Design a protein with these regions (language model features):
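Acidic/histidine-enriched, beta-strand-rich ligand/metal-binding domains
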Residues: 1-70
């Protein structure tokens, strides 16, 4: 999955697959986690948020289970 860079201290990049509704997050420490059944507006919100980390913590961590990829 192609990920786009994010200007953030903790998140390096994020990508989204419309067909599977999978959100991938690459963290600054190199970990990559996948979040399943994520609505497209959640991904768009993350990418446009003034604080991607705050958005991630408020809207993704609380509502979706992560599977570690790397």
């Amino acid at each position: 999955m192609e990920r786009k860079r994010i200007s953030s201290s903790r998140i390096r990049s994020a990508g989204y697959d419309d067909k599977t509704r999978t959100l991938e997050i690459e963290f600054s420490d190199g970990r990559i986690s996948a979040y399943m059944d994520v609505a497209p507006d959640i991904y768009r919100g993350l990418m446009s948020a003034p604080s991607p980390v705050a958005y991630f913590e408020d809207r993704i961590v609380e509502d979706y289970t992560a599977s570690r990829i790397k």
